[in-house]
Regions:
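Conserved N-terminal Rossmann-fold NAD(P)-binding element of oxidoreductases
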Residues: 5-9
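Hydrophobic/small residue at the entry helix of a nucleotide-binding pocket
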Residues: 13
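Helix N-cap at the beta1-alpha1 junction of Rossmann-like dinucleotide-binding domains, i.e.
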Residues: 35-38, 108
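Rossmann-fold cofactor-recognition segment
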Residues: 49-64
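Conserved Rossmann-fold cofactor-binding substructure of NAD(P)-dependent oxidoreductases
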Residues: 60-74
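N-terminal glycine-rich "phosphate-gripper" loop used for MgATP/nucleotide binding
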Residues: 61, 76-91, 98, 105-109
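Rossmann-fold NAD(P)-binding glycine/threonine-rich loop
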Residues: 105-128
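C-terminal catalytic/substrate-binding lobe primarily of soluble NAD(P)-dependent oxidoreductases
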Residues: 149-387
Length: 387
């Protein structure tokens, strides 16, 4: 039976999610936005790349709870493709309206608050899965896949990143999503597992060189939030769990300098009798420099795991690479981010995921994702080598 899936937000990821659900399921998609022009542009693009028989649209303000509740009366699943600050309120609306929900997360503290509503979600008969997407999201699911392949897993190292195919100096990066989300990843600290215990690790630390075939050498560094709640879930199961973000060489030194200057701060400062928030000022300047419009991109991911397989000590490598698709005009980042959350939305609509507020690592099995990824022509290579 076809379900109704509401996508809140008609930007890059909203378009990608709508495309994938329409292409790979029989469910109805309702895409919504507060801005009619953005919505019209999204519908026009979606109509050009997939059959839109099951697509409709709605104008709604995500902050207008009464309008949202009215819209949710006939919905089965919400896909939140809006910034993370709206997700906690949306979770409350989802539970109140008895509508399941998935979101793109981006802030672990908010995700924790969402997961604390597990009993409320169970009572409402709904499924809430926050922090989907590429990372956190797909990277976690791929790490879960590693634990499913090995008989016993001791260590997991993850590195992933979305990069422009043709980097522009000096930052060698293009903006593929909200700049606030980018700075949030570059600020605060990450949480890893070391000797089976949760440790706090500062952003931009542990910079190392990682090589990929046909791409060359990249720099991997610690950024925040990439593992979401996975360290807490696996603290009694893994000795080591780490996640780093990939960038072209030189990028991290610039970002470290900006942070040292205080440009990531949200604390107001007085300049010529004007109150200025450094982070807002920084975003206003840098966003224009990093937003290169529609550019061809590359997404890379590597899961390196150590453990036991058939009584032998082995190293397991799961490599994935994705490129911009000229036929659909979907970037690699849009595909990996949007399709991970759309796969979860479809799984929920098909009643394949239990009720409650569930973390990504507990919601979606690695092999289930691998099967769905193959249907979407993901380029994933799995290699096991005896130590």
């Amino acid at each position: 039976m076809a379900k109704n899936i509401l996508i809140v937000g008609s930007g890059r990821q909203g378009i990608s999610v709508a495309y994938d659900i329409l292409k790979n399921s029989k469910h109805n998609v309702i895409i919504s936005d507060i801005n009619q022009e953005c919505l019209d542009q999204a519908i026009s693009k979606i109509s050009g790349i997939v059959d839109t028989t099951n697509l409709s649209n709605a104008i709604v303000d995500v902050q207008d709870s009464q309008s949202m509740l009215k819209l949710l009366e006939n919905m089965d699943v919400i896909v939140s493709a809006v910034p993370y600050e709206f997700n906690l309120a949306l979770t409350d609306l989802a539970i109140k309206s008895k509508t399941s929900m998935v979101d793109l997360g981006g802030h672990t503290n908010i995700v924790r608050q969402q997961l604390s509503k597990n009993q409320q979600a169970i009572s409402a008969g709904v499924t809430i899965v926050p922090d989907c997407g590429m990372g956190p999201g797909m990277n976690i699911t791929m790490a879960v896949l590693a634990t499913e392949i090995l008989d016993k897993t001791d260590e997991i190292y993850i590195c992933d990143g979305g990069l422009p195919k043709d980097p522009n100096p000096p930052w060698n990066y293009s903006l593929f999503f909200n700049i606030e989300g980018l700075t949030n990843e570059y600020d605060e600290q990450a949480y890893f597992l070391k000797d089976g215990k949760i440790v706090e690790v500062p952003c931009f630390s542990g910079i190392e060189i990682v090589s990929f075939d046909k791409i060359g050498e990249l720099e991997a560094a610690v950024t925040s939030g990439g593992l979401s709640t996975m360290p807490w879930t696996f603290k009694d199961k893994l000795k080591v769990l780490e996640n780093k973000t990939l960038r072209y060489k030189g990028h991290w030194e610039w970002m470290k300098a900006y942070r040292e200057l205080g440009l990531f701060s949200r604390e107001s400062i007085n300049h010529d009798n004007n109150e200025i928030v450094p982070r807002n000022f920084y975003h206003q300047l840098l966003e224009k420099k990093l937003d290169h419009g529609r550019v061809e991109d590359i997404c890379l991911m590597r899961i390196s795991a150590k453990g036991t397989k058939d009584t032998k000590q082995v190293n397991l490598f799961i490599d994935a690479v994705e490129f911009y698709d000229k036929e659909t005009d979907l970037t690699a980042m849009e595909k990996w981010t949007g399709w991970h959350i759309s796969i979860l939305a479809i799984q929920i609509a098909d009643d394949k995921i239990e009720k409650g507020a569930i973390s990504v690592e507990n919601a979606l099995k690695g092999h289930t994702f691998l099967e769905e990824a193959k249907k979407r022509n993901y380029n994933i290579n799995i290699d096991i080598k005896e130590i």
